[in-house]
A protein has these predicted regions:
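Beta-strand secondary-structure signal
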Residues: 97, 171, 239, 263-265, ...
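Low-complexity, Pro/Thr/Ser/Gly/Ala-rich linker/spacer regions in secreted
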Residues: 233-247
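C-terminal outer-membrane/trafficking sorting elements
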Residues: 243-284
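Extracellular, repeat-based ectodomains that mediate carbohydrate processing or recognition
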Residues: 1-236
């Protein structure tokens, strides 16, 4: 039988007054932890018996969470939370982490945040700003993973710190000390310029295990979306040596065949020479 968890009901119009973003996480001894956003802020509940019964009151991580906000060039955006518990044999075993985004620092300054609890969700740390750039830029659509072999935290997000327009990079923030400090590094090789006339999607994602990290994100350029990853390891991050791909894509021409104008499209994942050979219909 379904169990209602939220105490404060939300609207059904899909904005910050709607109860959304519940992503459960298992604890080390049969606990289930979940955080979500709604009219009562960013809140948390837990079960100590594998979800059979739940805590009676919502614990506020932050009192106000406007998760529905605008990002220039993106048709819609959200800052809904992700919950993870450290099940690793590290010193941070049992720590619960919640990651989200919001515009608490201003409509032109979207940021990524992280809070943690070391007492089973009873109390929460003050939000830690994940992105380490100067104020005034947009970071958005984050997702978090925890390597359960060592307790390292990884957060992937879109980032505009390097530009004055809507050009967008992809960054990874990671912590090796239980979320006390985070290192930021750019993992997308080139920026892209999205347009709000094309649906961009609502999520990134990331997994990590035994020092291997695989983030997933979307690029939107020239009206077309594509899905990307990066081939990363913790040792590469430490050495700042990584690439998003090893090989370049095949050159595509359109229309094909062509009578007058013909356009060529290709992507370079790293700096390299490009050679294009054009043949007529007879193969010459």
């Amino acid at each position: 039988v379904p169990i209602k968890l939220n105490e404060v009901d939300g609207s059904c119009i899909d904005n910050s007054t709607t109860v959304e973003g519940a992503v459960p996480a298992p604890g080390p001894s049969g606990q289930v932890y979940v955080a979500w956003s709604g009219p009562n802020g960013l809140v948390f509940k837990k079960s100590l018996d594998q979800g059979v019964t739940w805590s009676t009151t919502e614990t506020q991580i932050i009192a106000t969470h406007e998760w529905d906000f605008a990002i220039p060039g993106i048709d819609r955006c959200n800052g809904m939370p992700i919950t993870i518990c450290d099940l690793s044999p590290s010193a941070h075993h049992g720590t619960i982490y919640v990651n989200w985004a919001d515009q608490s620092n201003g409509a032109n300054d979207t940021d990524i945040f992280l809070s943690k609890s070391t007492d089973g969700g009873t109390t929460w740390s003050s939000p830690l700003r994940v992105n380490n750039d100067a104020p005034g830029k947009h970071q958005f659509l984050s997702w978090m993973a925890l390597d359960q072999t060592n307790g390292y935290i990884y957060i992937v997000f879109y980032d505009r710190r390097n530009y004055t327009n809507n050009n967008t990079d992809v960054y990874l923030a990671y912590s090796t000390d239980g979320g006390s400090t985070l290192t930021n590094t750019k993992i997308g090789t080139t920026s892209f310029l999205p347009t709000s006339s094309v649906f961009f999607g609502d999520y990134t994602n990331i997994v990590a295990h035994n020092g291997v990290i695989r983030p997933i994100w979307t690029r939107l350029a020239s009206g077309q979306t594509s899905v990307w990853t990066a081939i990363l390891s913790q040792s590469q991050l430490d050495a700042k040596e990584f690439e998003t791909q090893d090989d370049n894509t095949t050159i595509v021409n359109y229309p094909n065949p062509a009578e007058e104008d013909c356009y060529f499209a290709f992507k370079l994942y790293k700096e390299s020479p490009v050679s294009i050979t054009i043949y007529d219909l007879t193969g010459k």
